[in-house]
Amino acid sequence: DPDKAEYNYVKDVDYISGAAILLSVDLWKQIGGFDERFAPAYCEDSDLAFEVRKAGYRVVYQPLSKVIHFEGVSNGTDVNGTGLKRYQVENSQKLKEKWADEFKKQCVNDGNPNPFRARERSQGKKVILVVDHYVPTFDKDAGSKTTYQYLKMFLKKGYVVKFLGDNFLHEEPYSTTLQQMGIEILYGDHWATGLWDWLKLNKDEIDVAYLNRPHIATKYVDFIKENTNIKVIYYGHDLHFLRLGREYELTGDI
């Protein structure tokens, strides 16, 4: 499902499919184009991505780039036949041999790998989960603008940033703005029902939970404290204790 949250934010990846690659002519010439050892087809796109990184550049997935790819139409799907598809197996071995040292640095596949880090090449980076009541509408209210500025700061500091809006909605143009910055937003029914299991599964991968506002923090802080070792940071935004105290004086309830 291309509309799933995990497929719709800009991120570093191992390689980009040959169905849709964009790089500058200068970089193409610097690398020397596709390595001819992979002719006539298969793995040349994977190899190109490794060459791009070797040259000091990033390989980035752009979710707003969309193409329709008819799998197998050009060369079929039989890797054991006599057609061009057979080169997929042969060239995969060539790729492993050429980049053996690089493959050793990848996430270990023990037969049941957790793709949390491998899918965005975040090995060695700190991960922060930012939770607020909804995606920051940064041109409408001060609280949202504050959250938005903190998100940008976390990115600048080198964090991998995940954002959770407690209403689990995808709100435009704000959601796409965050996703284009490289922030994964946890939205939709899947996350509304599966968030707690996700936190347990990835408790050793998330370094910090940054909780905004008292009514949001109270919903999440106990679960995080009781089920994970994630460091919790609370940001109140306002002097809520003063407001709540005055409300209690007037109404006898809060």
Predicted segment positions?
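Short, flexible hinge/linker loops that cap or flank conserved catalytic cores
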Residues: 7, 14-15, 121-123, 226
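Acidic/His-rich active-site region of diverse nucleotide-sugar glycosyltransferases
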Residues: 1-32, 37-39, 46, 54-55, ...
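Extended catalytic core of nucleotide-activated donor transferases of GT-like folds
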Residues: 5, 134-153, 162-254
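Non-catalytic membrane-proximal stalk/linker segments that position and tether the catalytic domains
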Residues: 3, 81-146, 150-153, 173-181, ...
